[in-house]
Amino acid sequence: MKRTYQPNKRKRSKVHGFRARMSTRNGRKVLARRRRKGRKVLSA
């Protein structure tokens, strides 16, 4: 059986990237939460 994590930069940013987060209402909520918490890195 192959491993579940097969790194791919393009997919990573398409799914978890900043622009992906900004494109939906819930994604913007995620960023707002992470800003409020004081996360150094907001998105992948």
UniProtKB/Swiss-Prot annotation:
Q: Which GO terms describe its biological process?
A: translation
Name the domain of life: Bacteria
Q: Where is the composition biased (Basic residues)?
A: 1-19, 26-44
Show the GO cellular component annotation of the record.
Answer: ribonucleoprotein complex; ribosome
User: Would the keyword Lipoprotein be found if you checked this record's keyword annotation?
Assistant: no
Give one GO molecular function term.
Answer: structural constituent of ribosome
Which keywords, in A-to-Z order, does the entry hold?
Ribonucleoprotein, Ribosomal protein
* The keyword Ligase is assigned to this record: no
What InterPro entries does this protein's entry cite? Ribosomal_bL34 (IPR000271), Ribosomal_bL34_CS (IPR020939)
UniProt region (Disordered), positions on chain: 1-44
Say which family it is in: Belongs to the bacterial ribosomal protein bL34 family.
Entry protein name: Large ribosomal subunit protein bL34
List the source organism. Answer: Geobacillus sp. (strain WCH70)
